[in-house]
Amino acid sequence: MSENASAWADLTGRTLTKGQGTGNDFIFITDPKAEAVLDADLVARVCDRHFGLGADGFIRAAHTETFSTGQKILEKHPKVTWFMDYRNADGTISEMCGNGVRAFVEYLRTEGLISLEVGEHVSIGTRAGVKTVARTDTGYAVDMGPWSFIHGDAAREGGEDSQVSARGLKTPRPALSISMGNPHTVVMLGSDGKLDGLDLGVAPVITPAPENGTNVEFVVPLELEHEPGDIGVLGEQSEVGAIRLRVHERGVGETLSCGTGACAAAAATRFWGGEDAPDEWLVHVPGGTLAVTFVLGPDDLEHVVLAGGAQMVYTAQLS
């Protein structure tokens, strides 16, 4: 057995599929009973863009009952069949990925593991809870659940809770920490030039440093670009906000897109904008455009709906 085959031994003979959502790309496998041993080194080798298949993350489709988190989900949601077992490119386990869950549902559908027509929805188990995904004419819309301030009232009152230093910025910038089931730190910049001048090949430094790391989003607000109702997620809206976004993902580095990051960035920008800020946002990332909408959820909390496309790219079998 070759050195490379030995390193990938637990995936030998398995079919792997690559998919993407706004350029955020993933490797998928179907492993209903979660039998494959996905240690961090194996996942990192597969996701390596020079010596592996290359991806921002690795996603296993498994039955919900195979995970302890999934078993807890089934106590309240017994019809959640599939669990998105998500790992970052470095092999670390992550709670949630907004682009990943859209691509995951597209993977399940194209593999014949679920049937989902336009207008129908499916519930997916994740480490951040159950996510409801609806198929639309142009892709998928995900109820990402409620967003929250990581540091609570202190962040709400001051509008910031940390400082971020990044290569390309002369001085640290104030930031706001947002949870989308996973941690985010959002920084607003004043111009496209500042955003484009960032070197996100080097991880930004956050003070105080989050115990479990964080995803860092840099945003620039834009003028309104569309007439009311154009993004079509939940009907007409009096106005639509817009931002540009670049992100450094925890355990990955800079990516072309981050779904939970788009939600967190829109939430922070909307909060900074005050009571008159819109509920619908277009988030422009290097890999495309995502629509983010804030709605009242069934639990009477403010939920975030993320909409965008997802496609499968290729399928391969390791030998």
Task: Identify the residue ranges that each predicted region occupies.
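Intrinsically disordered, low-complexity regions enriched in acidic/Ser/Thr/Pro/Gln residues
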Residues: V142-M144
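Short, conserved active-site entrance elements at the starts or edges of catalytic domains
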Residues: A155-D161, T207, N212
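Internal active-site segments that recognize and position negatively charged phosphoryl groups
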Residues: S162-D196, V202
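Short glycine/proline-enriched coil/turn segments at helix->beta-strand junctions
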Residues: T136-G139, P172-P174
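C-terminal domain-closing interface element
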Residues: I150, R156-L169, E302-S319
